[in-house]
């Protein structure tokens, strides 16, 4: 889920130049296929022992829900990505170099994405 803005920007500019389409046109095309989606990331600065407990709990499948968001399935390819009820997701990645737990989320609205992040943070601080 990390972003490489320079590469993405150059790729978009190249495609826009070749196709003659504006950025707005491209966004409309994507939304026509996928619908709108909103992504955000929060970095939680927590003690390493707390971070380790959270990651152990995620590995054990200890979280069935984050607030009102029920976990449907979990992927473990790059952290712990929990798919929620309506194709939203929340993902957890622990920094290996600092006391930080990164939480990523995506849904079909900005307010829902923020609510997912808040619910995840609230749940994790209960560990």
Residue locations for each model-derived region?
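Phosphate-binding and adjacent anionic-ligand microenvironments
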Residues: 1-106, 110-127
């Amino acid at each position: 889920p990390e972003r490489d803005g320079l590469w993405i920007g150059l790729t978009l500019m190249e495609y826009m130049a070749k196709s003659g389409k504006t950025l707005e046109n491209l966004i409309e095309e994507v939304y026509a296929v996928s619908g709108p989606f909103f992504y955000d990331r929060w970095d939680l600065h927590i003690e390493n022992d707390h971070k380790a407990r959270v990651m152990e709990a995620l590995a054990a499948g200890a979280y069935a829900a984050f607030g009102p968001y029920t976990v449907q399935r979990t992927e473990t390819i790059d952290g712990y990505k929990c798919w929620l009820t309506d194709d939203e997701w929340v993902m957890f990645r622990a920094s290996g170099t600092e006391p930080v737990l990164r939480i990523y989320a995506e849904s079909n609205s900005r307010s829902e994405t923020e609510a997912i992040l808040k619910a995840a943070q609230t749940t994790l601080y209960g560990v």
